[in-house]
Amino acid sequence: MPKFLHLADLHLGIRRYRSEERTRDFFFAWQDVIERYAIGEQVDFVLIAGDFFDARRVEPQAMNHAIACLDRLRAAGIPVVVIEGNHDCHEAENKFSWLRSLSQWGFLHLLEPIHDEGGVRLQRWNDAERKGSFIDIAGVRIFGSLWYGSTVGQALGSLIDALREHHDDRLYPVLMLHTDVEGQLNRPIPALPVARLNELRSHIRYVALGHTHKNFEIDGWVYNPGSLEACNVEEYFNRRGAYLVEIGEDGHRAELKREYQQRRIVRQSFDVTGQETPEALHQA
């Protein structure tokens, strides 16, 4: 039975609270998850659904953190399949990016659909050119997508047409998508409507989401693991992790794995009633 690990929002290289230690926390989470649930579970492949890096311009330390685990996976014979997120997507006027370079160097497979005047085209992965829009691994057909932002609803129509063209009943179809989804946010920004998402259902059996930094599932076929580490204090209280997914004759079983190295955050509160000066507060 095919088995894979679904991650998202690693944000390698993040510099939160100007703390070098917090930057390393994100590496330790990534490293521990890979050792426990990718190599330890002998998965067939790993999916990273966007925001592998925290920024387009990747610092040397972040690249070291990425390659350290990518090299372990490559040595174990476990392919890594990645899509761009809003943090690490390539610039429109520049055909180069660090994710594309890592793909060219053989550390990962970056999946990118082709958008032109005719709509969306999906190309099978070409191992010689190290590029493509979908790839077949262990009986699973994995489709990639771009970071569409607030236009994701409109982009989905053309993407669905392309998915229909490349559907194969012999393969288990998985789509990687980096987007917010309606009903999962605490802030009023445009998100992909669930009704629009449901239009994928005749072509896709598992949607591997990223972008929202908390775990959620929709109807047993849409999965968002959340970020591996908390990007701020508020996020610490969100449920998050990595999905270990097994595919069988009756579909798939996705289990959220949460036991791995993370920074513990303690929130403390103080009653300052009646303390009128900094000195009085300090004494209290």
Annotated model-derived regions:
Residues 1-24, 130-133, 246-247, 251-267:
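Domain-start "cap" segments at the beginnings of catalytic or binding domains
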Residues 232-284:
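C-terminal functional module detector
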Residues 45, 56-67, 71, 75-239, ...:
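His/Asp/Glu-rich metal-coordinating catalytic cores
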Residues 1-69, 75:
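N-terminal active-site segment of His-dependent metallophosphoesterases
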Residues 31-42, 161-164, 279-284:
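A short, well-ordered alpha-helical element
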Residues 31, 42, 61, 104, ...:
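Residue-identity detector for glutamine
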Residues 7, 11-15, 47-54, 83, ...:
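Generic alpha-helix detector with strongest preference for long hydrophobic helices that associate
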